Amino acid sequence: MDPGQITFLADLVALRRDLHAHPELAFAETRTSDLVADELTRYGMQVHRGLARTGVIGVLRQGSSERAIGLRADMDALPLTEENTFAHRSRTPGLMHACGHDGHTAMLLGAARLLAEQRNEATFDGSVYFIFQPAEESEGGAQTMVAEGLFDRFPMDAVFGLHNWPGIPVGEMAVVAGPVMAGTCAFEIEVQGSGCHAAMPHQ
């Protein structure tokens, strides 16, 4: 990697670790949204705030096309106590980024920075909306953003999101035609034992 790529990667790692150390629950992602807005402003983007309380939208336009896409990441953490001992472990008792939303937020900031830095290199023609969504963890943050006018204010031809998946080898990705991980349901069980991610109880 060239020096610029090394610096870029180091900056993303630092962002992710900062976010991991400061988890916030659904609709209370105030520090996180401040950090996101500051970064997007630093990249030279228009920044819009207030959708779903703590949502942030970064706008990057280039060329004359009316085409537009959205890139989306979630920001909220979970009410869990982190037992890790590394330096960037959660500093908030009882809260933890246990589902990777710190990574999602850092990755989307990385994409925003990369496209902003290359905006004069004809990388795209149209608009890219960077959507930082609060309250993904069963709190309806996406639905709230839509109900409050996300697509009315920022019309898009398509929206793309992703989710980290540790079981996929580094450098590979899985793609599904249509919705994936788009459902939620609630139930209660009582388990005695070590905690885990509900999607991977066997691990």
Predicted regions and their residues:
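Acidic/His- and Gly-rich active-site-bordering loop/insert found
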Residues: D2-H97, D102, A106-D125
